[in-house]
């Protein structure tokens, strides 16, 4: 990837607004800190603990946020979580059940629970995105596709996901775009 990596140092950089970015998976959670320009710290990996109890999962999210806050060395104004569905992205509430991951946090507002465990994030804004959409937007804004008007991203992991981006925004309907931008149910041939 063509992302810029940088460890934050120096007076001016300390004063920059920082964002904690988390890619929440079923096996591991990847995280780093970024500024508005996409300058970021090295990606760190943490165990997901996705099959544990409610308290252990929430405590794990809090622990990860605290560790990344130390790397931010400045003001954290936002937390972005790329997380698989089903999930209520607008309200930050997991709707996962029967997937052998994150069942214990079904119906729990994550922003409230993480802020209760990490009071230093009290004024930080949380944004939740579907994991494949977050990847696609990152590629569109900062990655190898930043000069493209339209892109299709396909991710294969535990499951398979897809996202369409046009002019820097995700597209879920329209000509050539299947419902929700999901290609997994499209016939081959």
Predicted feature residues:
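Short, acidic Gly/Pro/Ser/Thr-rich loop/turn segments
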Residues: 29, 86-88, 161
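Short loop/turn motifs that cap or connect beta-strands within the blades
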Residues: 46-48
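Acidic active-site catalytic centers that drive phospho-/nucleotidyl reactions
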Residues: 23-25, 35, 88, 131
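Residue-level signal for inorganic ion chemistry
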Residues: 31, 81
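Glycine-rich phosphate-binding loop and adjoining helix at the ATP-binding site
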Residues: 50-62, 66, 75-79, 85-150
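A short acidic Gly-Thr/Ser loop motif
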Residues: 22-27, 155-159
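Glycine/GP-enriched mid-protein hinge/lid loop-to-helix segment characteristic of carbohydrate kinases
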Residues: 3-16, 32-38, 42-44, 53-55, ...
